[in-house]
Amino acid sequence: MDYPDPDTIRILITTDNHVGYNENDPITGDDSWKTFHEVMMLAKNNNVDMVVQSGDLFHVNKPSKKSLYQVLKTLRLCCMGDKPCELELLSDPSQVFHYDEFTNVNYEDPNFNISIPVFGISGNHDDASGDSLLCPMDILHATGLINHFGKVIESDKIKVVPLLFQKGSTKLALYGLAAVRDERLFRTFKDGGVTFEVPTMREGEWFNLMCVHQNHTGHTNTAFLPEQFLPDFLDMVIWGHEHECIPNLVHNPIKNFDVLQPGSSVATSLCEAEAQPKYVFILDIKYGEAPKMTPIPLETIRTFKMKSISLQDVPHLRPHDKDATSKYLIEQVEEMIRDANEETKQKLADDGEGDMVAELPKPLIRLRVDYSAPSNTQSPIDYQVENPRRFSNRFVGRVANGNNVVQFYKKRSPVTRSKKSGINGTSISDRDVEKLFSESGGELEVQTLVNDLLNKMQLSLLPEVGLNEAVKKFVDKDEKTALKEFISHEISNEVGILSTNEEFLRTDDAEEMKALIKQVKRANSVRPTPPKENDETNFAFNGNGLDSFRSSNREVRTGSPDITQSHVDNESRITHISQAESSKPTSKPKRVRTATKKKIPAFSDSTVISDAENELGDNNDAQDDVDIDENDIIMVSTDEEDASYGLLNGRKTKTKTRPAASTKTASRRGKGRASRTPKTDILGSLLAKKRK
């Protein structure tokens, strides 16, 4: 591709590269970094002005030396060179880069010769952790090879500051918002805690581009970021985290901006969304013209074929005939392998490499099989199927995933949870595990077991939501001190609360102590952010022609003369701009859009987008810290719907809590039987230290 003209900003867009995914696998271990290298070579060969990466560059927040080496090598080969970077930075980068020393863009550093700058945000996989709250993107920023922007310092008070660029007559405002837990971000937007700083707007002078990394669709009422929460001055939103590639712009008619969902560059789960063709995108922006987007297919993607069948739909199969079922499934897999190999040959022939490859790359194959009992008979017997691992091992050496070619699952039946299960209602029986296993599509995660166990237990001290998240950090992100730190923090908080309760200090009754502890636990689980009293925002032009921001009858001026703040209104979820009539600018000019129109219906009450307290309810606030499974990180994925359904059931079960009783009620209840437990003994000893 030729060089862009002096007034065109050319951007390569990518997201969810997941370098390091499954890197110990002898067949697919190098797929992620090879594709990332291809992406960056496309940026170099197409003479782009910058690369924008919308999260999850690495698959884990502690990447291996191999993954880190491959990324550093690729960035050095593709981003450094003699070609000058023609972008002029107009804003103060120290407001965006939250570092002590490296507060400038890397291409303006005299110690580096950067030809293609990379701007990236952190995702949910490579997020910050540890005492210093550092993530892999911080390390790359310190090396000078990446510009890490969009960091979130406080999740309940977020200020989104753009980087302002100019090339010729074209001006670009680049916004970034790193990954925040979806429920928490939903609550922050709802409470008016998100502030956008916007450049001076004149007749569409600025092209406003934003990168986010959140759920795009609702797994629960609050576990996603609605497009309606984003301000309407944006022109385009790059949506990371979702792995399905949608190779066209989708227009939001309510907010009047376009949404691009690039998808992942490597298949991290064997599901339908990952089976779609994968692209990177080149965006050309020129002042006065509609943006031009060009999708470029990725060539290093391993061929992936997926098929779903139901044994009920095969008339000649009988539930008890295991051999006939296995024979039929083998035929289906053989057909999928033939189709995948033909597609790989065609791809190599188009690239001119058909005769140079000694062996075809092995494809990824996934056959999902519903083995539920036939619905047209009274027999409750399910189809007899072979062990999935043994069945899959037939194809070792011919497919890339020789251990999980087939996935057996049953249709979900209505779930009725018993209050008592096993001993004291806190244990999970083999039948419970089997039910969870079948509901999750044959692949069970530790997170699902922990969530189900906590729903059946009646913890009197630790909040289940926080404990669930601590276990996830311990298992998924190898944070060995996550559980210890969480328990120590919660005990310290609750002991501090109880030490100020005079009635608790006076009583020695164990039952009364337990009742008071439950109240403290409920209060500790729900920490709502108080809504701001006045979020109304007004804009006016001052004497210098620059915007100023007024909120709550106070005038607040920003530090940069080119940027003005914009608050997200707590009532309507949009940015209100009311300007003086004497200098009222015209609205954003209508661009000729080539985007696919998608009619977005008005959100009903069931989606809980409105900020009315009676619609959201206390239960949603109480469960704002529920962590939703990231289906895109599963080595062999289940359906997102299956995973979210199990968590949603847990959520509904958990929200049925009794209202907090008063201390007087607790006192009367404590006059009955009395029994001491190790938990109350521990609290008693801690409180004794407090008394001293």
Curated annotation (Swiss-Prot):
Source lineage: Eukaryota, Fungi, Dikarya, Ascomycota, Saccharomycotina
Pfam entry (one): Mre11_DNA_bind
Polar residues: bias regions: 575-586
Assembly with partners or alone: Component of the MRN complex composed of two heterodimers RAD50 and MRE11 associated with a single XRS2. The MRN complexes dimerize on DNA to form joined MRN-MRN oligomers required for DNA double-strand break repair.
Compositional bias of kind Acidic residues: 612-629
Binding site for Mn(2+) 2: D56, N124, H213, H241
Gene3D superfamilies for this protein: 3.60.21.10, Mre11, capping domain
General function of this protein: Core component of the MRN complex, which plays a central role in double-strand break (DSB) repair, DNA recombination, maintenance of telomere integrity and meiosis. The MRN complex is involved in the repair of DNA double-strand breaks (DSBs) via homologous recombination (HR), an error-free mechanism which primarily occurs during S and G2 phases. The complex (1) mediates the end resection of damaged DNA, which generates proper single-stranded DNA, a key initial steps in HR, and is (2) required for the recruitment of other repair factors and efficient activation of ATM and ATR upon DNA damage.
The protein's enzyme class: hydrolase
Protein name as annotated: Double-strand break repair protein MRE11
Compositional bias per record (Basic residues), positions renumbered to this chain: 587-597, 666-676
Outcome (variant: D109G): Does not affect ability to mediate DNA repair
Origin species: Saccharomyces cerevisiae (strain ATCC 204508 / S288c)
Comment field (misc): Present with 432 molecules/cell in log phase SD medium.
